[in-house]
Amino acid sequence: MTAFLNDFSKFYGTGEKNEAGQNLEEFLELYDPRKYETPSNTTDAVIFAYEGESCDSIDGLKVLLVKRSNHPSIGYWALPGGFANMREDLDETARRELEEETGVKGLVMEQIATYGDYDRDPRTRVITTAYMAVVPENAVKVQAGDDAADAVWCEVNL
């Protein structure tokens, strides 16, 4: 098997051979990535918006939601998000999916949590990393796209 990365020099460790007598190149040549079941990785973006000059209170706070246009959960409201590409960092996935589904781009988002219940998606095992941003409502314009039927700001009632 060819190594997943072209440059794996930072993974040499001390340069020792393992118990099977393999150096890193030999180990990677024989490694089978199908040996273990692997989950899919997704990201979701929790984007809050506030009215006015600053976010001094949670009164009037809104969250950005998209209406799913495909299965699973077709017609349900969800956070914007989706699957990571194989050679894409999760930060990039969060930005790409947010833009594809809502037209929103250029936000600075913070990684806030990871969700991994094994039965959270009927398609396959999915681990989701959530990102968050808080923005003035008038700073972003939302437009549904990709697999989102609609994209709207919804009031948060706590």
Describe each model-derived feature in a short phrase.
Residues 1-158:
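N-terminal leader/linker segments that precede catalytic domains of diphosphate-processing enzymes
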